[in-house]
Amino acid sequence: MKNKEHYEKLERMYLNARFNTKIYDTTECSIEHEKAEIGLTISDKYFHALGAIHGSVYFKLLDDAAFFAVNSIVTDVFVLTTSFNINLIRPANQGKIKAVGKVKFKSRNLFVAESILYNEEGKEIAFGTGNFAKSKVHLSEEIGYL
């Protein structure tokens, strides 16, 4: 399989996941070698009491971007997040936000990736670093890899 086909299958798997079609329905995804971009349009359904997006949304986008940056180079199995640290810099309450994930380290069993979340003006609003490992779950049609 060519890399482009692998990236497109990962994108479809991600965008068709029930979590994204039901809750994060404006999600966009682009995957290439050791890099992934995950974005969405902010909606008030993601807001906490102070009228800005909840930290869980920051985490989701940062983790997903780093995760798919890693899975872009793992072509046989699904990877797993083993740990992830985030830093929230500023709030966001309108427009589009985009997380850009990149692989920083890779070995046979451990991967480290970082991601940065940007607001619509291109300002950094959060960043994170995660550790990832290969699972025993093969990439297949059963998990939406088509």
Model-derived features: where do they sit?
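Terminal targeting signals and extreme-terminal segments of soluble enzymes
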Residues: M1-L146
